[in-house]
């Protein structure tokens, strides 16, 4: 099973969090993109992956999307995603 945890932070307080489970046979990359799309589905556009996000995610299976990753203004400091379980 693949699980990705998404958290929205503002002023060092977690505003919202969501864990996405994926049991599909997709590649790890597809699972990450699908989970991120699901986290952003309700009220947020999908962030743009910058080089710093890609590098952090490769190294730590975790990254933070700040205002520069979004086209529209966001009402929080950053969106953090982290892989918490992988097969």
Where are these regions (language model features)?
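Short, flexible N-terminal segments of the mature chain
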Residues: 14-42
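Generic structural motif
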Residues: 11, 23, 84-86
């Amino acid at each position: 099973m693949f699980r990705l945890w998404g958290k929205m932070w503002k002023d060092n307080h977690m505003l919202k969090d969501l864990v996405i489970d994926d049991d599909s046979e997709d590649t790890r990359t597809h699972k990450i993109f699908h989970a991120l799309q699901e986290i952003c589905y309700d009220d947020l556009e999908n962030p743009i992956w910058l080089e710093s996000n890609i590098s952090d995610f490769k190294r730590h299976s975790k990254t933070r999307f700040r205002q520069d990753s979004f086209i529209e203004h966001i009402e929080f400091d950053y969106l953090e995603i982290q892989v918490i379980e992988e097969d």
